[in-house]
Amino acid sequence: MSERKLFTSESVSEGHPDKIADQISDAILDAILAEDPEAHVAAETCVYTGSVHVFGEISTTAYIDINRVVRDTIAEIGYTEAEYGFSAESVGVHPSLVEQSGDIAQGVNEALESREGDTDDLSHIGAGDQGLMFGFAINETPELMPLPISLSHQLVRRLAELRKSGEISYLRPDAKSQVTVEYDEHDKPVRVDTVVISTQHDPEATNDQIRQDVIEKVIKAVIPADYLDDDTKFFINPTGRFVIGGPQGDSGLTGRKIIVDTYGGYSRHGGGAFSGKDATKVDRSASYAARYIAKNLVAAGLATKAEVQLAYAIGVAQPVSVRVDTFGTSTVPEAVLEAAVRQVFDLRPAGIIQMLDLKRPIYKQTAAYGHMGRTDIDLPWERLNKVDALVEAVKTVL
């Protein structure tokens, strides 16, 4: 009997409470970076019925209207009706932002290497905190992402498209998806076993109507027919009713969907969240760099899947460790890949910022539907412009 395995990942829509918080935090970050690219930002958001609290630490020369940024973000998501219990113009906005700690700033603004006499400009910035970050890539999809998270993101994005276009008029902003994929004995995806979709809706919509629309206009529009069969299970709004949703149904916080933001649990995670943080925070920038490395390694044919771990000490520019794990799929020893990675990629915070041009206001667009593997927007860590350099570096190491 051949061994078959199941793996499940989930995603949530832009109207999910935690994702509202992420988008507000990144909208604030973008607004600040648009005026002050050198700003240090750590903006956290909490949302609940009728209220938004924004708090954290910011050092900047910019002035932004946080109240307006918050309301505009909520309106763009689709919370514009009072009956939702959370609407752009009536919600209470409560900002409480202070300046970044001087003790932290001194290590970020002047790294240990710089204090010890290193005159390289890229050694000047130290990591904003200690920590470990992972990046991953696999050849299951054209964007080199695991199939379960890729499909999960596409499903909730499709729901949002149908809601905003008015094609399904009874949809409301909050939604979740979950996809279980069956893999064969060679770890290749062969079919979709289960799809779960819960979508907020107007009270007049019937369960039968929702089920039919979601299966025909969402699931079958997203998941290739080859992956669906008579045994595929669909659970559509399995509680039977989802009228109360968004922050009226659950409170939301920045940084509570870190697995949705990355690889759906298929790869390890260092625990740090992304949204609301400028690029001196390696939780964010080094995670992007690790994805950039892993994706280019797989695209170069050096492995069929790759996980890259980076780790840092606060106030120190150079990473304390770089590890490449290819799970036995690499064409050369992993030590060779690690050496090649160190040759090709400057993994000091300032090196990552320069390499990926991370001082720009590009972050709000990442705050829903995943930071990795995006095909709908142009993100620098998704580019395959280091393939040739990696192949050549491997040759020099060998």
From Swiss-Prot:
ATP binds at H16, D174, A175, K176, R241, F242, D250, R256, K257, A273, K277. Catalyzes the formation of S-adenosylmethionine (AdoMet) from methionine and ATP. The overall synthetic reaction is composed of two sequential steps, AdoMet formation and the subsequent tripolyphosphate hydrolysis which occurs prior to release of AdoMet from the enzyme. One of its GO terms (cellular component) is cytoplasm. Keywords: ATP-binding, Cytoplasm, Magnesium, Metal-binding, Nucleotide-binding, One-carbon metabolism, Potassium, Transferase. PROSITE patterns: ADOMET_SYNTHASE_1, ADOMET_SYNTHASE_2. Its EC number is 2.5.1.6. Its main location: cytoplasm. Homotetramer; dimer of dimers. InterPro entries: ADOMET_SYNTHASE_CS (IPR022631), S-AdoMet_synt_C (IPR022630), S-AdoMet_synt_central (IPR022629), S-AdoMet_synt_N (IPR022628), S-AdoMet_synthetase (IPR002133), S-AdoMet_synthetase_sfam (IPR022636). This is S-adenosylmethionine synthase. GO terms for molecular function: ATP binding; magnesium ion binding; methionine adenosyltransferase activity. CDD domains: S-AdoMet_synt. It is found in: Cytoplasm.
